[in-house]
């Protein structure tokens, strides 16, 4: 649960008084155009950007007030795929997936290898354990990144623009994988995206950020927002593609 959260840099506030709740097993989408504060909010949720005000609670525990050992335990419940999705280029896929297992578990080398194979199979990369990232397509690299993010069986999977740079068909298949992971494992997903197709395919609930007004201007599923929002910026985004529509208007 996020309550009264304000985040920024120095004295500059980027978002004010952000509040929302993510239900277990939900796909919760953080929406908004470029520069709206989506990535900054994500960093705050991951404990990487201290809030200026308010609090972030996981399972009733306030992240910023938890003692270091307990805080590490909370963060270990998270799996993260950042927008870069960077895999270690000199490591095989299995070795990439093994990194968090080697850092945070006491499994033997054989057990780690078995888990890595399982996670790669989970995302549709069975038999690809010994490939290097450079041998993969963009979509396969994103899948491998998700496999690594799922290595420790996280309660919450955070995905930052996972479809960025992918063609529409590959993006659709990645969305289908995200849905399958949620449906089969019950994993809660927090998704940052401005991809309209992904938003409508995936979102159970979400918030819409307005960087100019430094706050949330919409909350609910995309269909609820379309039906009930009176914010023109929200309606434009959900009907015309947000950033794409703004770019077209500027060119006109």
Region annotations inferred by a language model:
Residues 62, 109-127:
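Conserved ABC ATPase "signature" region
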Residues 63-79, 109, 225-229:
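ABC ATPase NBD coupling module
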Residues 132-136, 140:
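Conserved ABC ATPase signature
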Residues 54-62:
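Conserved ABC transporter NBD signature motif
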Residues 46:
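Helix-to-loop junction immediately C-terminal to a conserved catalytic motif
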Residues 157-160:
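Catalytic Walker B motif of ABC-type/P-loop ATPase nucleotide-binding domains
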Residues 151-155:
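A short, proline-enriched helix->beta-strand linker immediately N-terminal to the Walker B motif
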């Amino acid at each position: 649960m996020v309550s009264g959260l304000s985040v920024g840099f120095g004295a500059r506030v980027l978002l004010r008084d952000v509040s929302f709740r993510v239900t277990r097993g939900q796909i919760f989408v953080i929406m908004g155009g470029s520069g709206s504060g989506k990535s900054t909010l994500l960093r705050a949720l991951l404990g990487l950007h201290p809030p200026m005000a308010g609090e972030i609670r996981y399972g009733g525990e306030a992240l910023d007030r938890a003692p270091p050992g307990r805080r590490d335990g909370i963060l270990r419940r998270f799996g993260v795929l950042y927008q870069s999705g960077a895999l270690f280029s000199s490591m095989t896929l299995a070795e990439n997936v093994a990194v968090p297992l080697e850092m945070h578990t006491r499994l033997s080398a054989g057990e780690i290898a078995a888990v890595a194979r399982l996670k790669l199979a989970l995302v549709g990369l069975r038999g690809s354990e010994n490939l290097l990232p450079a041998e993969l397509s963009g979509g396969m690299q994103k899948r491998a990144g998700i496999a690594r993010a799922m290595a420790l069986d996280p309660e919450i999977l955070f995905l930052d623009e996972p479809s960025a740079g992918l063609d529409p068909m590959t993006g659709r298949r990645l969305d289908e994988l995200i849905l399958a992971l949620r449906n089969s494992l019950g994993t809660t997903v927090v998704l940052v995206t401005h991809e309209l197709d992904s938003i409508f395919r995936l979102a159970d609930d979400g918030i819409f950020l307005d960087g100019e007004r430094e706050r949330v201007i919409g909350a609910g599923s995309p269909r609820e927002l379309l039906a009930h929002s009176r914010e023109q910026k929200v309606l434009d985004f959900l009907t015309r593609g947000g950033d794409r529509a703004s770019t077209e208007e500027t060119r006109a």
